[in-house]
């Protein structure tokens, strides 16, 4: 009788424990229901609604642009105004959270300005066909996708209509500094870039960045956006790629985000952001001569290097 009582008690405890576990799991999953319902309630954006672009993008203007992300009253961008022209390379610099990536996303129409206007060739970006605009822009963000495809497919996926253009493919691989990466793969361009596949391999972050840069360049565009695509590369590789970019994209508008002093000097103009505001703009020489916030950012990079050099000498 005691054994039966003990066994029954164990079963009851087990059932209670299982019930509590299931209840806790249900509660955790219920927390996501509100987000799921919000997703269901979202209206699908009509990317083909608006005026199509009939001319290449020659100018981009931000006119008193403010932006705050959904569910927050804090502005990520505040009263930002500037004009960009084609045939120039622009660099964005600022501390983390200063609004650099946000600015690029607004340009891609991933978000709408809270206040102010963005003009493309003098036309309000909100009046322009979204799909047509994005076809003219090639971008690589920090969280770029690493497709479980072949190396070739990872590059040509940005422009499937010209995926068989082997000359263009070879050129962008060289421009992105990815030739050494491809040559080191067991099946070169036909290598699967994910372990688990027959003959597949996994790349380092720096190698992936070069593949992603080649992907961005394979799509011939009016505007090229690079959001810190060189973070895992050494300074020499970054300078080499930017120099090649300047040659390849000389008829376009190129914008890149970087924190490296050596690469900033290769830009025609630099936009300096601080806490969401555009505080300075000009060439590297002009900004250095002004001796303001840009100079502080550069000095913060150079001083540790000088200190290490002094330690080496001792």
Segments predicted by a language model, with ranges:
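ABC-type nucleotide-binding domain
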Residues: 53-314
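Pre-NBD coupling/linker segments of ABC/ABC-like ATPases
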Residues: 40-55, 287
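Cytosolic ends of transmembrane helices, especially the final helix of ABC transmembrane type-1 domains
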Residues: 5, 10-40
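Generic structural signal for alpha-helix termini and adjacent loop/cap motifs
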Residues: 22, 42-43, 290, 300
